[in-house]
């Protein structure tokens, strides 16, 4: 049965470049969409630039151009980057569109008519220097729940909590740095708390198409935490309005009031699809009416789960539309075990990757080989990237065609033999359903492992039958024809399995194989005596220099203040730090559960620490000062809790930094904590 499916990726914001972190999500989505299309389903992939809000307005002002001109330029750049990585959108649109304005206003009116909108006079933070009300993302401060520093005014990127900017501790304006003032303003609220019963049912429910949950298990657990237990709910009503000046859509019958960007951004999915429907004649209502029998899936990052699993389904349902079939979240991208860094050159933009001449399918394959259906971070290990691409794609896959095609062309007029009874091909075809299920469930890593295991079987067959030797032997033409025909058919099957991940290679292979296109049917069907064309090289190896040049091209000089050592006993005091700099550091008391020496290191000690709210492992280079590390067990220490995780060579990942004092003789001493302090207590 042919399925009707609408798929989206989260909308990239229109004030920055596309980087490999964005690409993780769009590759994940594109692979899934291409798989559905290969299976013959009616599947549409829509996305758009997220264009509204104060950041865009201020960025355009800084450039001296109109916001409309800036977002048009950025959209063109974004689309070029995604197209360069073979992301096959059916439509890539903009949230600043007539369709999006209409849908946003219609949904607002429907929610209002349904009693889900109310106006309130609120106290809002106002920047006295810039004379403007501050949007949530332009207020920063300390999270009121987990006390992480330097968090935005609408949600915490550490614990995921959403809140009002007035709830921030020690807030400051991200525009001017000034301490904001509270002033009154009328705002409009979506009464999300009244939607709790629906959301509890939807988040814990299954979709009717295949019985699978709407959310991943990790996401559902988070929703239960946010929704509360029983009849109680912790959901807060959602402020959906912002004051002028603001770049966005004005709220109907409310001059000077604009829709908050997070209201019209997901509506952009509808707008992009509607634009596509109008162009090619699709029935839009069939996909968005309340009783729709079609499927709709959103692929997103874990940091925007709250918006997509709570606000968005509630907005849709209570405005008379269908809710999503599934919301699939993924983790963040790290590079070599660490957060992407501009100074290290690992904050890699899509444009630089393409401009350096690297094959985008190398990255598509590597990212897909790391992805599964869970909400887990993905690490791009650059050495592993080189070795895996060269081993799997060049060594195992494309070489199969290269080793057989020449004999077919020269000895058999480019026409393979009918080998439909081949045991080798039967083995490959037998995995079609299993690999299809893995793609369907977004278990790409498992799918690609199984595909490469099949490639290993084919290469073992090559080594066992040695076509290059058969070609030299008298009377072995028929056997040579049979072996090479099996290899060409095996290559075709492997290409079909890999086509969702390697669309350009599959298209090039289709030309070589003299096929209109590769489809999923090619995982089971043989070519028969179908004539093929002359083989053309399909993929080059990754060279170390290419990766080195890529990293160098992405390095940005970041000036850091260094404190030169003054002659004598003490180091010179470092350059003055402002209050805001200090507030970025989140220091906590932690209890040492276990401390031990690190095998293979003369400097490191491994600390198992209890922070109260969670347990972590931190490595510290103080082994010389504590020859008996077990004596530290049970001790309280002070640690930087929001220090970016660091990969410590072969020893593991360090999840923070323990504070110590450097004595005049060069030894490091842990800082003492007074009696009564508990794990998790803030220091400052």
Swiss-Prot record:
Motif mapping: 'KMSKS' region: 339-343
Entries under InterPro entries matching the protein: aa-tRNA-synth_I_CS, Anticodon_Met, Met-tRNA-synth_bsu_C, Met-tRNA_ligase_1, Met-tRNA_synth, Methionyl/Leucyl_tRNA_Synth, MetRS_core, MetRS_Zn
Highest rank taxon of the organism: Bacteria
Residue ranges occupied by any tRNA-binding domain in the UniProt entry: 581-684
Main localization (coarse): cytoplasm
UniProt motif ('HIGH' region) ranges: 12-22
Annotated GO MF terms: ATP binding; metal ion binding; methionine-tRNA ligase activity; tRNA binding
Chain residues that bind Zn(2+): 143, 146, 156, 159
CDD domains: Anticodon_Ia_Met, MetRS_core, tRNA_bind_EcMetRS_like
Cofactor(s) this protein requires: Zn(2+)
Catalytic activity reported: tRNA(Met) + L-methionine + ATP = L-methionyl-tRNA(Met) + AMP + diphosphate
Residues that bind ATP: 342
Cofactor mode of binding and number, as noted: Binds 1 zinc ion per subunit.
Enzyme nomenclature, EC number: 6.1.1.10
Cellular component aspect of the GO annotation: cytosol
Subcellular location: Cytoplasm
Record keywords: Aminoacyl-tRNA synthetase, ATP-binding, Cytoplasm, Ligase, Metal-binding, Nucleotide-binding, Protein biosynthesis, RNA-binding, tRNA-binding, Zinc
Stated role: Is required not only for elongation of protein synthesis but also for the initiation of all mRNA translation through initiator tRNA(fMet) aminoacylation.
Quaternary structure, from the entry: Homodimer.
UniProt record similarity statement: Belongs to the class-I aminoacyl-tRNA synthetase family. MetG type 1 subfamily.
PANTHER family xref list: METHIONINE--TRNA LIGASE, METHIONINE--TRNA LIGASE, CYTOPLASMIC
HAMAP family xref list: Met_tRNA_synth_type1
Protein name according to UniProt: Methionine--tRNA ligase
